[in-house]
């Protein structure tokens, strides 16, 4: 069974760094918006039946920019089996607008709170259990740059995608 997992989030939140770590790719990473303007595809290092899609960084699913059109069309048109929503742990509030839009799509979501190494270094704490309960999705602490938590995020996404694939289609039952 093949599984498609999309990486979605704001610009500069670590999507491509996570993509490179999960796939063994070497996509260019830059510290400014607009580096990734098209979707990139790679096979998950741990399971070749899993395809990871690196989507351009966007602030909203409203298609105003080319990046937003590419990301929105993929999420709505091709409907991946799961989404890893990467958010910048050093600026959660800015990221949650897109997160709520993504969750409204009805596609299983794992939220990966990235840059946790920086959050902890600054002495801040993010209550991921509380965030998970409030949002209604799995929340995992990661550092894409250091590689911590990334396999947990990927495996949770694979798990929820597999459960979705095994569930009967409600429309076909009626």
Predicted regions and their residues:
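Helical mechanochemical/support elements of P-loop NTPase systems and associated helical scaffolds
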Residues: 33-37, 51, 67-70, 79, ...
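Conserved C-terminal guanine-recognition region of P-loop GTPase G domains, centered on the G4
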Residues: 42-47, 70-140
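Conserved G1/Walker A P-loop phosphate-binding module
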Residues: 1-64, 77-78, 82
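Conserved nucleotide-binding/hydrolysis micro-motifs of P-loop NTPases
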Residues: 25, 34, 57-58, 89-93, ...
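Canonical P-loop GTPase G-domain recognition
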Residues: 117-169
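Signal for well-folded cores of large energy- and translation-related assemblies
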Residues: 23, 60, 75-76, 103, ...
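Conserved small/polar residues in nucleotide/adenosyl-binding loops
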Residues: 173-174
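Alpha-helical scaffold segments in soluble metabolic enzymes
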Residues: 17, 21, 70, 152, ...
